[in-house]
């Protein structure tokens, strides 16, 4: 991976990091997933050099608040230009999510490797979705989809496990969390300085 080059090659050549982001990294994938190792290549996506991205089952915690216009959420741990250190995690590193399972994402696509929990107002489309069972415009805690066609998961936590989602906390421990965990508890676990202990 060459961090001084863009992830996608120019339209006319196959250079830069295209081959690298198509590499499947087995430890990035949950064995219980129900999808292939990499995004299928179709003529439309290949024309834009997007086919074949390798999937990832785990996503960094960006937090809960809606992002500012054109920006990303920044009350979590991992986000673009994040500089959150242990001293910034005032809710306690044993109570704060560092990263967790997602239904799918692409490790070579920066934002796809991140997740955000819905906000209380549910005023931002990425926050809400379909939980795989019932169409809803209410915040869903886990397993949310962008559309009822069940085709694409959009920037949230979830898993192919029946009842739980695995999370790594900032103290290095791992917890399996029930998919029915109260939304307010999950929201508190996704912020690094929300005064919830």
Model-flagged regions — what are they?
Residues 1-197:
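Surface-exposed loop/linker segments characteristic of extracytoplasmic
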